[in-house]
Design a protein with these regions (language model features):
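Feature 14080 marks short, conserved micro-sites in well-ordered regions
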Residues: 1-489
Length: 489
């Protein structure tokens, strides 16, 4: 079953499900019903899911939804009074009766939280969801970050916890903080009274990934700045500061954590080499700079870290060739630029994807614009597949930072992506089997030069799901089935 955020124009944005048929596509539950003023007027559609839409052709930014083996976890609002300001974790088994808020971890605060000047702490709802699928007798769980203060209670009885690492199995009793990295040691004054102690910030864990039974993430403290941590879920595990990479309080600002082989790659600044590629096996002594790609303090700022077999592909700027494609086997000698794709500047590869042992990505050159490329990790084996939008114009314009959703995805034995071939078809659904002749338009959903702007691809069973736009229907859910091959909306 496919779960997604949908809006039927009546109930607002809610959790929906689909089995790929019209009859099997319906709202799971109206968790946040219509809200009106005291006179029963000025009603809103409600909607429990927070969706931001803007003028982009690609529409909206949607809430986090992750799936275990038998449960769905997502973030949203159920309309409980006092909880409107921050999202909580919602759990669902796909039925209305089995869909509910796990715990209202943030409610509107006691005025005393604000201190003498009425300062309001930054509200951090549940986010950064990472699912741990059920195993044996342990049910599906999700790790997430949240700032907690229980509503209806005074600051005396329940001081606030800053944003920290939590876990839940979907029940209140199974919801608890994993690690309180920054303790509640802040004090303040309000209305002539002194209050102690609380925390309005927390360690703000970020870049959460699961590697075996261990959660790797970054967190920030006054003592170390933002550094690399891990938390072992097994017996004898617990919290560990992997390494104070940039010794002192400044922090190394680690990011882009990616599991490859026995360790984790990341980008970090040790205070000497700038932001460079690191590899860690989980402790201080074996967390090292792989290579000083851009010598000196400027750093190469590794991005787009992507696993292919036992190697890591990524992009970096060595200070001479611009941002290009690199590969690493975790050794200095095995870390090198694959190819200087744009010899007059940066090709800025992005949307790196792996299919059948080959890397596919979008890259820019002055002659062809941004187009689809492939690489086997060698210079000769790195080349453009097809100039979809002929000449210097690009067929692909979007960066992962701009768009929160999939525009490039592996499905079955093909890579599907959104592309614009110029004036003939507009921006539509394309696919490739890895050859120039096999790189082709799937269907012109809005005939002619107008565009359907397909996006948010998701591969499920034998179908490719996505959203697509037309003036008649607006943006709707579609799927593509390669056998027998129709597009169905």
């Amino acid at each position: 079953i496919l779960y997604f955020a949908g809006n039927d124009g009546i109930h607002g944005w809610e959790l929906w499900r689909s089995d790929g048929s019209v009859g099997g596509t319906y709202m799971v539950k109206d968790l946040r019903e219509e809200e009106c003023d005291e006179n029963g007027e000025n009603c809103s559609n409600g909607g429990s899911l927070q969706v931001w839409c803007w003028g982009s052709p690609f529409g909206c930014h949607y809430p986090e939804i992750v799936a275990g083996n038998s449960k769905i976890f997502l973030t949203g609002f159920d309309g409980e009074p006092g909880t409107e300001s921050a999202a909580n974790v919602i759990v669902s088994d796909g039925t209305a009766s089995g869909t509910q808020t796990v715990r209202h971890q943030w409610r509107n605060w006691d005025p005393a939280y604000g201190g003498e000047n009425g300062w309001e702490p930054g509200i951090t709802g549940a986010r950064n969801l990472v699912v741990i699928p059920s195993t044996g007798f342990v049910s599906d769980r999700v790790v997430y970050t949240v700032m907690e203060t229980i509503g209806g209670q005074s600051v005396d009885s329940h001081p606030p916890f800053g944003e920290e690492l939590w876990i839940t199995d979907g029940t209140d009793v199974g919801t608890y903080m994993l690690a309180n990295i920054v303790p509640e040691d802040e004090s303040w004054e309000y209305d002539g009274a002194n209050y102690c102690c609380g925390d309005f910030q927390g360690s703000t864990p970020r870049d959460l990934i699961m590697k075996g039974n261990t959660i790797w993430f970054t967190a920030k403290t006054d003592a170390y700045g933002r550094e690399l941590y891990r938390y072992g879920m097994n017996v004898g595990g617990g919290l560990f500061l992997v390494k104070d990479i940039n010794v002192g309080t400044s922090g190394s600002n680690p990011m882009h954590l990616t599991s490859v082989g026995p360790g984790v790659y990341l980008s970090a600044d040790n205070g000497t080499n700038g932001q460079e590629l690191h590899y860690s096996l989980g402790n201080t002594f074996n967390t090292v700079v792989v290579k000083d790609i851009n010598p000196g303090v400027n750093g190469s700022s590794p991005q787009e870290l992507t696993k292919l077999g036992s190697n890591l592909f990524f992009t970096a700027d060595d200070g001479e060739n611009g941002r290009e494609l690199w590969v690493s086997d975790s050794t200095e000698e095995g870390t090198f630029m694959v190819k200087d794709i744009n010899t007059n500047g940066s090709s800025s590869p992005n949307w790196l994807r792996v299919m059948d042992g080959t890397l596919y990505f979008m890259a820019y050159t002055e002659d062809h614009g941004r187009e689809l490329w492939r690489s086997d990790g060698t210079e000769s084996g790195t080349y453009m597949l097809r100039d979809i939008n002929p000449g210097s114009n690009s067929s692909f314009h979007w960066t992962p930072d701009f768009f929160h959703g999939e525009l490039v995805i592996v499905h079955g034995d093909s890579l599907y992506f959104t592309a614009d071939d110029g004036e003939e078809h507009g921006t539509e659904l394309w696919k490739t089997n890895g050859t120039a002749n096999g790189t082709e338009l799937v269907i012109d959903m809005v005939p002619g030069s107008d565009s359907s702007w397909p996006n948010r691809y998701l591969s499920f069973d034998d179908k490719l799901y996505f959203t697509s736009y037309s003036e008649e229907r607006g943006r709707q859910l579609w799927f593509y089935w390669d056998n027998p091959g129709p597009i169905i909306g």
